[in-house]
From Swiss-Prot:
It is found in: Cytoplasm. Responsible for the release of ribosomes from messenger RNA at the termination of protein biosynthesis. May increase the efficiency of translation by recycling ribosomes from one round of translation to another. Keywords: Cytoplasm, Protein biosynthesis. One of its GO terms (biological process) is cytoplasmic translational termination. One of its GO terms (cellular component) is cytosol. The lineage of its organism: Bacteria, Pseudomonadati, Pseudomonadota, Betaproteobacteria, Rhodocyclales. This is Ribosome-recycling factor. Pfam families: RRF. GO terms for molecular function: ribosomal large subunit binding. InterPro entries: Ribosome_recyc_fac (IPR002661), Ribosome_recyc_fac_dom (IPR023584), RRF_sf (IPR036191). Belongs to the RRF family.
Length: 185
């Protein structure tokens, strides 16, 4: 029972880390990367699909993404979807390919994005701490039901605290990397 609780708690904490990585990947730095457009949805014959299902996304250079649709009539829809996404990008339709230049970030915008990164990190830390609280509550309930001893509870709480510390440290590391990425010119 205790090992199952630890395992499920660790899996949930890992999901929090994965969600943070996904959220951080959406935050635009000055450098282009193909994952930046992953969440852009395009209308394709009446249904909304991810952009990577209707186009090939490549890097043209360090500051430009190239989007080549598989069907030429989709160029306009893909261009509109990129323009309408919340990344502040201005795509240029070149006839065969859509060029998406990455505008340079201003100092003020970098600071704003750093605040957003910290906020995302704090949300992830709160999620990890809530998982710790839930696990500890399960342990207390098990002691109350006399399923486990108090010694097992204390040992398990220590293990869960170590897990929490490990994942909070990983969150801090991810945040530091993203902030450093944002501040590079």
């Amino acid at each position: 029972m205790i090992s199952d609780l630890k395992k499920t708690t660790e899996q949930k904490m890992q999901k929090s880390i994965d969600a943070l990585k996904t959220d951080l990947a959406k935050i635009r730095t000055g450098r282009a990367h193909t994952g930046l457009l992953d969440h852009v949805m395009v209308e394709y014959y009446g249904s909304m699909v991810p952009i990577n299902q209707v186009a090939n996304i490549t890097l043209i250079d360090a500051r430009t993404i190239g989007v080549q649709t598989w069907e030429k009539p989709m160029l306009g829809k893909v261009e509109k979807a990129i323009r309408d996404c919340d990344l502040g990008l201005n795509p240029a339709n070149m006839g065969e390919i859509i060029r998406v230049p990455m505008p340079a970030l201003t100092e003020e915008r970098r600071r704003d994005l750093t605040k957003v990164v910290r906020q995302e990190g704090e949300t992830a830390k709160v999620a990890v701490r809530n998982l710790r609280r839930d696990a500890n509550q399960h342990l207390k309930d098990a002691v109350k039901d006399k399923t486990i001893s108090e010694d097992d509870e204390r040992r398990s709480q220590d293990d869960i605290q170590k897990l929490t510390d490990k994942y909070v440290a990983e969150i801090d590391k991810l945040l530091a990397q993203k902030e450093q990425e944002l501040m590079q010119i």
